[in-house]
Amino acid sequence: MFNVKKATNDCIQWIRDWREENGPGCNLIVGISGGVDSLVAAELCVEAIGADKVLGVIMPNREQDDIDVAYDICQYVLGIDYLTINVGSAYDNIIDQMDLAFNVTDQTLINLAPRLRMATLYGVSQSHNGRVVNTCNLSEDYIGYSTRYGDAA
């Protein structure tokens, strides 16, 4: 039978071990969307190394109706510091420049924002002695519905 407590403790220990091997003393950088995947990943990180070593990054694309959920998760659920970096203007500027050069496909419109979030996470990570945390779930990994080096870090 599946033992949730053991699986949770195994994940927490894995995070501690991975951090020790890949960046002793580093911070863990988590993209916080307000969804379950980023919440669980961030909570495991907090349990593993403490809230003071976990930094949330909230990255709306222009306006986001449910952005308060992400803020509440950081402030009241996790107790972590967070940054808000709106990727909307970068998204708009890149799309405008692409439109000048070629016809932008719907796939490009869909996938650009997650890729901008990925680059943002790595920029934050590099500036905060951090490592980017994978917030994908197994089903997303299995079907390939993730952003390489982004939520699939």
Language-model segments: which ranges?
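ATP-dependent adenylation/nucleotidyltransferase module used to activate substrates
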Residues: 1-147
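Gly/Ser/Thr-rich active-site loops/lids in small-molecule metabolic enzymes
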Residues: 150-153
